[in-house]
């Protein structure tokens, strides 16, 4: 089978691009042709996307589009239009936590393209409810993660070494983490916080930390996705505080590496994490509650360790082998 994966692709950044890279690797390992067509580029470069995709797509059986809201919907516009015209099998995976706002704002646009695919895939029950609301067809297949037991580190003692691997963009609400960490430092002055990544707020966040006088904070700058596990291995607790989200792979990576995950209770996250079972949840933008969860984790080591073990077991459902048959059925591959 020859498959073309279409998205706003950038190598080494994780997110949607990371998912596409994993899919390409797994499909190639099973002797299928799997290539990536990126719709990312300047405005003028994107004007030629339809023509370029028509030339490329003729050599493929399936177009698998990965899209989200805003400009992230461009792969759907280009991929569905070309795929339908060329009578290709068109599969679309919708990512991102901003789907509800985008669908409500652009119902005709969304309906036009998402009713012209062969199959729509959503990652969790969170997006499934939005698709139901707009009477759009879908099937649920979660994000996938490459599991490797060598990446898991058993921690005998949970230390107050915190990490966040989310991009420094407004929707990820890193200021909430800085405020919570400042409160944690008053109780646990040996605490450390590593903020991995960059983004439009990177400079402002560094300035905020300086203005607040927060100590023991490390800003790494941009890190290639292949290096993420090195930073996770040096930490014990992952913090995530977005105001909107869907099914973040960063949380799965942390569970896979043996960290305790503390996340805001938004979007699709509660479909992944059950509070007190395989992670801890707090109300969005509530840095006081986040700080309490951070302190609780250090003060309740035995329970926290049990949560980590349960999370590590739960993450196995997101491996390629668990969802491969669903993808093969959708692609029309007979294994």
List the predicted regions and their residue ranges.
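Short hydrophobic beta-strand element within catalytic cores of glycosyltransferases
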Residues: 260-263
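Donor nucleotide-sugar binding/catalytic pocket of nucleotide-sugar-dependent glycosyltransferases
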Residues: 115-151, 220
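Short alpha-helical donor nucleotide-sugar binding micro-motif in glycosyltransferases
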Residues: 222-223, 230-235
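A short, well-ordered alpha-helix in the C-terminal region of glycosyltransferases
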Residues: 289, 296, 303-317, 329
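Aromatic "clamp/platform" in nucleotide-sugar-dependent glycosyltransferases that forms part
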Residues: 243
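Conserved acidic donor-binding segment of nucleotide-sugar-dependent glycosyltransferases
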Residues: 275-276, 280-287, 296-302
């Amino acid at each position: 089978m020859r498959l073309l994966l279409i998205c706003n692709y950038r190598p080494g950044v994780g997110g949607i691009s990371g998912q596409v890279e994993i899919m390409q690797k797994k499909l190639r390992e099973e002797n299928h042709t799997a290539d990536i067509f990126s719709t990312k580029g300047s405005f003028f470069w994107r004007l030629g996307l339809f023509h370029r995709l028509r030339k490329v797509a003729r050599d493929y059986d399936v177009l698998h589009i990965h899209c989200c809201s805003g400009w992230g919907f461009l792969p759907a516009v280009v991929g569905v239009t070309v795929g339908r015209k060329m009578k290709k099998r068109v599969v679309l995976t919708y990512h991102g936590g901003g789907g509800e706002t985008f669908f409500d704002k652009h119902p005709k646009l969304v309906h036009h393209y998402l009713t012209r695919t062969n199959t729509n895939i959503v990652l969790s029950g969170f997006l499934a409810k939005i698709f139901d609301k707009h009477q759009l067809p879908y099937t649920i297949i979660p994000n996938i993660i490459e599991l490797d037991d060598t990446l898991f580190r058993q921690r005998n003692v949970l230390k107050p070494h915190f990490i966040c691997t989310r991009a420094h963009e407004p929707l990820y609400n890193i200021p909430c983490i800085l405020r919570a960490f400042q409160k944690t430092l008053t109780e646990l002055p040996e605490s450390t916080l590593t903020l991995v990544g960059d983004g439009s707020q990177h400079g402002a966040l560094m300035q905020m930390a300086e203005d607040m006088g927060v100590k023991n904070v490390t800003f790494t700058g941009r890190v290639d996705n292949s290096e993420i596990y090195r930073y996770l291995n040096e930490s014990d607790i992952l913090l995530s505080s977005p105001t909107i989200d869907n099914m973040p792979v960063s949380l799965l990576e942390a569970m896979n590496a043996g960290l305790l995950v503390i996340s805001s209770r938004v979007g699709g996250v509660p479909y992944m994490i059950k509070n007190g079972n395989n992670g801890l949840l707090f109300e969005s933008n509530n840095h006081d509650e986040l700080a309490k969860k951070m302190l609780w984790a250090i003060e309740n080591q035995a329970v926290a360790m049990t949560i980590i073990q349960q999370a590590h077991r739960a993450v196995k459902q997101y491996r390629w082998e668990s969802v491969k048959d669903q993808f093969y059925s959708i692609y029309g591959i007979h294994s």
